[in-house]
């Protein structure tokens, strides 16, 4: 999928902002909120952010050739004097209107493709990745791993880009041939209105567990942010994991006119094969069977019974697979075709990705689990595939919710046989302090080691583990960097695990 070229050659501001303000009839080449991406002829959009204001970067934008500045006079910041050749347009309430402005600028790309927006604490990436694969050659993925048609992706910066960048990427995907797009939607994106202006006929919730409380403050605020997805423009279907407590509540208060598909992947608690509590649309597991090659799921939908085999492992991946099945059915894909496409779909990079260290060595598993719930689920999934000891290498991110650190320790101690505590993006915090907060949650009944150098920690666990053992390397997944201070240093758990596996006799 070639996404190299932009299809927008320039738009007149008077037309773009019609109905908002009277703007001059000048043409701008592109829109951007990031001063670093400004090119000559662009309009720089300067708005208040979480920790700074776009006007703080105005000088940089002008130096790079911005020909116009759009700003909101109601945000309490005055616009500095501009060079005579630069046009300024003040737009009251610009932040609330920017999604629609960007949508118009890029030719309303979400009218040219059917989008599925997926939110939730855990599982967004896997679900979107699986869904994009099921969509085939006309499908695309946009999220944490980048954007494009799996497995060939262009790197991205955020799970969900800002509203201008998002519309730009959608236009590129559509122009490259995408007609169905699976989109990860983060709680930050929903809170910051990054998906405003995007039409999302299909929506889904995976689950809601503790994460991002450094940003949202409370679980109630976190849940409220997630719920905004189902009030976005053009929502027609909501596919919700009702095995999750928040999901069950959300399913009772969807907006009028939104068709609900209930997904239940836990046979012990699932309703009988007539559907989830009488729902007209449902995907319900009646049996989940783990085996050496993955999962076998037996279930029932409003279209009849189903049987699904997948190379993915773990009960949580049964939830992910059934959620994607629900999205496919809601999007009009026939059940046999949906099952066939899911059977051949593979897990994304860094999501329970296995590296076998020869016949005499352990299996290394790289995973993105970085919340207590995700870590517990990954350990539980791997326990079913571990004849020997289960090791866990993990840490906790700096400048993020410190309250989850002892919880991560408790979960790791409960689920693993041996632990290695290490660094995981300490950022501007003291790494020793982070490790100390993690160890405070340990009781001491499981073997535990501390090795702050992450590469050495992984190598230590790989050397100490034996054939039949599994080493879960948790927290970073696909990431290829380690953040110390404000510096990103090259570091890849996947690359190291692959090298250790290749070097094993």
Each PLM stretch: what is its role?
Residues 76-78, 147-149, 189-191, 245-249, ...:
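Short, active-site-adjacent cap segments at secondary-structure transitions
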Residues 58-63, 174, 196, 231, ...:
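Non-catalytic positions within long, well-ordered alpha-helices that form the structural scaffold/packing
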Residues 97-242, 246-258, 386:
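Phosphate-binding loop of NTP-binding sites
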Residues 67, 201, 417:
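Receiver (REC) domain switch/active-site residues of two-component response regulators
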Residues 73-76, 144-145, 187, 208, ...:
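Short, ordered loop/turn segments at secondary-structure junctions
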Residues 77-83, 176, 191, 200-364, ...:
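Acidic, Mg2+-coordinating active-site environments of NTP-dependent enzymes
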Residues 2-119, 126-137, 223, 307, ...:
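Short, basic phosphate-binding NTP loop
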Residues 1-27, 37-43, 53-56, 259, ...:
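ATP-dependent carboxylate-amine ligase
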């Amino acid at each position: 999928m070639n996404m190299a070229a932009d299809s927008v050659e320039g738009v007149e501001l008077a037309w773009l902002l019609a109905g908002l303000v009277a703007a001059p009839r000048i043409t701008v080449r592109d829109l951007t909120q990031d001063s670093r991406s400004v090119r000559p002829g662009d309009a720089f959009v300067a708005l208040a952010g979480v920790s700074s204001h776009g006007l703080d970067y105005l000088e940089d934008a002008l130096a790079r050739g911005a020909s116009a500045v759009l700003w909101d006079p109601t945000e309490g910041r005055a616009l500095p004097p501009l060079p005579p050749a630069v046009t300024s347009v003040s737009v009251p309430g610009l932040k609330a209107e920017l999604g629609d402005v960007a949508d118009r600028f890029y030719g309303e790309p979400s009218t040219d493709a059917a989008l599925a927006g997926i939110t939730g604490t855990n599982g967004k990436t896997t679900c979107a990745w699986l869904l994009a694969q099921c969509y085939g050659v006309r499908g695309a993925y946009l999220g944490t791993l980048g954007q494009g048609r799996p497995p060939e992706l262009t790197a991205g910066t955020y799970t969900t880009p800002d509203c201008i960048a998002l519309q730009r990427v959608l236009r590129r995907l559509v122009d490259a041939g995408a007609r169905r797009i699976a989109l990860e939607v983060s709680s930050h994106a929903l809170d910051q209105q990054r998906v405003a202006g995007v039409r999302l006929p299909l929506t889904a919730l995976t689950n809601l567990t503790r994460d991002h409380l450094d940003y949202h403050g409370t679980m109630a605020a976190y849940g409220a942010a997630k719920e905004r997805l189902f009030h976005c423009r053009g929502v027609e279907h909501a596919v919700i994991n009702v095995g999750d407590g928040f999901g069950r509540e959300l399913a009772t208060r969807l907006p009028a006119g939104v068709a609900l598909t209930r997904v239940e992947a836990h046979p012990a608690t699932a309703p009988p094969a007539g559907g989830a509590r009488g729902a007209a649309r449902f995907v319900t597991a009646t049996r989940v069977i783990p085996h050496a090659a993955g999962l076998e799921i037996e279930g029932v939908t409003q279209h009849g019974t189903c049987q699904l085999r997948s190379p993915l492992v773990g009960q949580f991946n049964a939830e992910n697979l059934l959620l994607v099945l629900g999205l496919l059915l809601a999007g009009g894909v026939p059940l046999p075709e949906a099952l066939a496409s899911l059977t051949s779909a593979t897990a994304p990079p860094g999501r329970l990705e296995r590296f076998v260290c020869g016949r005499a060595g352990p299996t290394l598993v790289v995973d993105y689990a970085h919340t207590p719930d995700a870590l517990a689920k990954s350990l539980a999934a791997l326990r079913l595939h571990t004849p020997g000891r289960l090791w866990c290498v993990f840490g906790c991110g700096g400048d993020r919710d410190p309250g989850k650190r002892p919880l991560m320790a408790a979960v790791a101690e409960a689920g693993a046989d041996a632990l290695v505590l290490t660094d995981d993006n300490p950022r501007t915090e003291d790494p020793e302090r982070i490790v100390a907060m993690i160890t405070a949650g340990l009781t001491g009944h499981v073997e535990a080691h501390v090795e702050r150098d992450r590469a050495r920690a992984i190598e230590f666990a790989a050397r100490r583990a034996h054939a039949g053992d599994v080493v879960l390397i948790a927290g970073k997944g696909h990431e290829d960097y380690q953040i110390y201070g404000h510096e990103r240093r090259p570091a890849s758990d996947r690359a190291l695990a692959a090298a250790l596996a290749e070097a094993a006799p």
